[in-house]
């Protein structure tokens, strides 16, 4: 796969490249997966209105979330045990979120401490899952 154009492309690539145990953990939801299925169904229901022949020169995805300026209205959600995928997984994700101007949420099940993540991002604010 030379070009990734959607989340499904990433999932297919991960299934080929990531050890099975780690892939299964990341690709699944917890317990009965009811929230996972509900999220998938809700996501499928989102439709974007096409705007043809509209000047896009001054468009921006920037907005605010919880009073903070963000580059776009998305955030990295908490993912438990990200360190199973990469030893510094949470810190790398927090740095990426900072670089792209979006919020990062540290999981309660993180293998990295709040202090380590804060230091890794130069004290950049992030959210914490309680």
What annotation goes with each model-predicted range?
Residues 86-88, 106-124:
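Active-site-adjacent beta->alpha loops and helix N-cap segments on the catalytic face
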Residues 1-70:
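An N-cap/entry alpha-helix motif that binds or orients negatively charged groups
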Residues 84-98:
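Glycine-rich anion/phosphate-binding loops
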Residues 78-84:
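Glycine-rich phosphate/pyrophosphate-binding beta-alpha loops
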Residues 81, 94-95, 119-120:
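Alpha/beta enzyme core
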Residues 74-77, 104-106, 126-130:
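Hydrophobic faces of well-ordered beta-strands that scaffold small-molecule active sites
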Residues 19, 76, 97:
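Conserved, mostly hydrophobic/aromatic
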